[in-house]
Amino acid sequence: MGCVTSQEDKAAVERSKQIDKSLRMDGEKAAREVKLLLLGAGESGKSTIVKQMKIIHEKGYSQEECLQYNPVVYSNAIQSMIAIIKAMGQLKIQFGHPDRAEEARQFFALAGHADEGEMSQELSGIMKRLWKDVGVQECFSRSREYQLNDSAEYYLNALDRISAPGYIPTEQDVLRTRVKTTGIVETHFTFKDLHFKMFDVGGQRSERKKWIHCFEGVTAIIFIVAMSEYDLTLAEDQEMNRMMESMKLFDSICNNKWFTETSIILFLNKKDLFEEKIKKSPLTICFPEYTGANTYEEAAAYIQLQFENLNKKKDTKEIYSHFTCATDTNNVQFVFDAVTDVIIKNNLKDCGLF
């Protein structure tokens, strides 16, 4: 009888061990599954971060995939020139050369009939001459007074290259393309033994109602702010400062009851554009109370503090902040490596394994 009981006890102990082992394996598996939500206002750089994940953690863009971006590159370059020339009328800026006004009319006519995925030599020739005009350059230097794609200068400076026969976009060209994200774009990749699911959500106000069902079971939120937009207004609301809109959105995400346990990672993005802009456009445009110097270091630290101060649970919740340039692959790789280490540590802690 005692022998039978002993065998039953052994079996029960063995079963208990198996259950513990299974639970531990489930815990470890859960700790290796990471659901990342990319949030931020429109044009903050979320989609560029997703493209970088493909370059860094997958095989990058094949020649065929790069070729598919031809129409987007051409469209971005043409739309940038259209925006600048239209703004010249609004800002009452004259062309530096008398011939350019007629060429601007030709440009609009050619741009309106350009085949998608093609840029004729005639069109690119006119665009190159317009781009060199002192009036066009003056208008470009005042781009904070109207809506202009961040990549305008990059593409317009590269017109020789991008309009050449047989042009294939480089990965940097692809990274710089701008297409408004509508809906939710999901990306999967593996890094440091973790299985990532990254969700890029449209940032414009009209897209935000679609975020809600993505929130369940999120491991971390990467909130992206375009630092360089401190002196700009929203495309969808000309009265609203873009930085203020970002702060409002960050406040609602950071202090949301659903995200009490969620790691919040703050990417202060477009640091390269910010570093150039702060030399000529004071931070007081956005923060009238700012009394520091208009240097990159002081102004960037002030912006970081403004966002981190929105956190109402400083004693229990940490904001992990990083300065980023989403178009710089090395910078994104370095930052994402640090972010992943934080996620691993927090995941193991949540699963009782740390």
UniProtKB/Swiss-Prot annotation:
A lipid is attached at C3 (S-palmitoyl cysteine). Residues 35-48 are annotated as: G1 motif. It holds the Pfam family G-alpha. SUPFAM superfamilies: P-loop containing nucleoside triphosphate hydrolases, Transducin (alpha subunit), insertion domain. GO terms for molecular function: G protein-coupled receptor binding; G-protein beta/gamma-subunit complex binding; GTP binding; GTPase activity; metal ion binding. Keywords: GTP-binding, Lipoprotein, Magnesium, Metal-binding, Myristate, Nucleotide-binding, Palmitate, Transducer. G proteins are composed of 3 units; alpha, beta and gamma. The alpha chain contains the guanine nucleotide binding site. This is Guanine nucleotide-binding protein G(i) subunit alpha.
